Amino acid sequence: MKTGVYAGSFDPITKGHQDIIERALKIVDKLIVVVMNNPKKNYWFNLEERKNLISKIFESSENIKVDEHAGLLVDFMAKNSCGILIKGLRDVKDFSEEMTYSFANKKLSNGEVDTIFIPTSEKYTYVSSTFVKELAFYNQSLAGYVDDKVIVDILNRAKEYRDRG
């Protein structure tokens, strides 16, 4: 059984992320979606909330596990005996950055981690968590950008931010 890892901050998970997850399952038998914290980012949702949003979308998927990790992703992968890292790419900028991480992960894992790049579907090339949060903050429709199961959660969080002034 081939197990892959798809990691990100997912603040919040978007249809773009969801698309990569679904397409990754055509390559691997099981996918661990790892929610991580990036110290450079400010989050709307805490780690547990982000995991719950993902779980809500994939609750009926037996071959998807949602987990979390603080630290180097290669350490998580070693601990879970995973050698396949899935990365979604929206554009050349993403490719350039992820290619560098790919080399680093290969080196840090002593050659045990291979990265598979999946280009985003065209309709999601401009969709990002930041874009979704901006739409939500201004009380715009999130249809087509996030799964229906999490729209209310995101809009409620946006309202909290608006109410803070």
Annotated model-derived regions:
Residues M1-G165:
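Nucleotidyltransferase catalytic core that binds NTPs
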